[in-house]
Amino acid sequence: SEMCIRDSPEHSELSVLHLAWYLNYGLTREELQSGRPIIAIAQSGSDLTPCNRHHRELAQRVRDGIREMGGIAMEFPMHPIQENGRRPTAALDRNLAYLGLVETLTGYPIDGVVLTTGCDKTTPAALMAAATANIPAIVLSGGPMLNGWHDGQRTGTGTTLFKARELFAKGSIDFPGYIDLVGSTVPSIGHCNVMGTASTMN
């Protein structure tokens, strides 16, 4: 890694700066000077991104696995992307997430990365960034959300939304009913469960 390259008398000041600032939360100088690979975990889950929110827990398991295999784990957040919460469009965020990942993967002392994804924005952003940075990478998808139920009928994130919109426009359901019907389509965290790009690319 870049950190190990700069761990030398020829670059003493840079070595000190690189090493010292990573010693304040549990890493040791011996670890950082051991030559062991530094594996990043690009964590895409947050309260703003419920599609990927479970990656906050899964990232800890990834961290444990990296340590078990002899690596040094360093976790960092990805730019948040959530299709339905972002206005005017989440498509712009895909590019921001990509650019942020490229800068992180190329500018920090990282030898490899585990990219946590789960929708049709975080997945391409992560894949493009890994290809651009040209470092070893594993993509971990969180999987789709569960199917929902409403009045005994199975509901899904795409078809039910269009049906609910039509029912509301006709006056067949009121606004709270509109919210309840659409809300039934997202009973758990995970990416959209329809045959759209979130499912096909994950």
Model-derived features: where do they sit?
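Histidine (H) residue identity feature
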Residues: H11, H18, H54-H55, H79, ...
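Active-site cavity-forming subdomains of large catalytic enzyme subunits
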Residues: A91-N202
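Short, small-residue-biased leader/transition segments that mark boundaries at the very start
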Residues: E2-I5
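Long, structured ligand/cofactor-binding scaffold of large enzymes
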Residues: T28-S141
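Short N-terminal or domain-adjacent regulatory/targeting segments
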Residues: P9-R36
